[in-house]
Amino acid sequence: EKPYKKIFGEFEGRHAATSAESETGDVKYHLGFAATRNVGGRDVRVSLIPNPSHLEFANPVLQGVARARQTILGGDGERDEATVVPISIHGDAAFPGEGVVAETFNMSRLRGYRVGGTLHIIANNQVGFTTDPNDGRSTHYSSDLAKGFEVPIVHVNAEDANTCIRVMQLGVEYRAKFGKDFLVDLVGYRRHGHNETDEPAFTQPAMYTQIRSHPSPRELWGERLVKEGTLAADEIQKLDEEIAANYERIQSSSSASDGEGEGPGEAVKAQDEAATATL
């Protein structure tokens, strides 16, 4: 995971690299990142490619990166599709609205471009910046485009953490067995604005009246744990206070160069090296 020190530091303008070559002109949450995680005793390399404000443009780039790395890791010029699993996270308005999404799906099973399946997640907050779904698409579901490519689609309540985990496990198993794309429509909502300067109640007043009176996922999960007898209410409150205090401590001492992991420069460099090795 990306250390909180790095995240807080970048939001406050303290970047590890300050040279002109390192400036992207884009927002900080579009920067790439790479790190190694230990999962079940095995190291897994996780890379987030830079995804610019050109909506969905990163999708074909991700396919190329995945295919190149599959070739490198496969050895002897043979691709091993099990070594690299691409994951695309889409917006519910951008998914049907940007043509590059359909173009990338069309290449997904072509022998010159296939990567053995991509896991797609639509972060469906039921609003596209300030556009309601009925003004942004001609289909019922934001995921309907994928039906034309016979991609399995699962709609899941984003507030149900256990079900979300099970659905992703299903997607991983499907991809491993059939080598094809799998899509999860993660239906939730956006509690705050599109970005730091957007006040959503100006354009969606009725929607945000409901959202602001609705318990957060953390509150709902806490209520569930209390009901199940897993934790007591005072234990949850204590955890909340400890986490908030920890955030404050980290933020007060953060800089973008703190913590482990690689920033956008290293992530891009790694992708360049992968592409060069493949060529």
Residue map of PLM features:
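Active-site-proximal loop->helix
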Residues: 144
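Flexible glycine-/small-residue-enriched beta->alpha junction loops
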Residues: 208-214
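Hydrophobic side chains in beta-strands
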Residues: 122-123, 186
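Short, internal active-site loops enriched in acidic
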Residues: 91-94, 189-191
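A mobile, often basic/glycine-rich helix-loop segment
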Residues: 203-205
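Conserved internal helical-beta-strand scaffold that buttresses enzyme catalytic cores
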Residues: 1-87, 93-101, 105-118, 124-138, ...
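Conserved phosphate-handling catalytic cores of large alpha/beta enzymes
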Residues: 128-139, 147-193, 197, 201
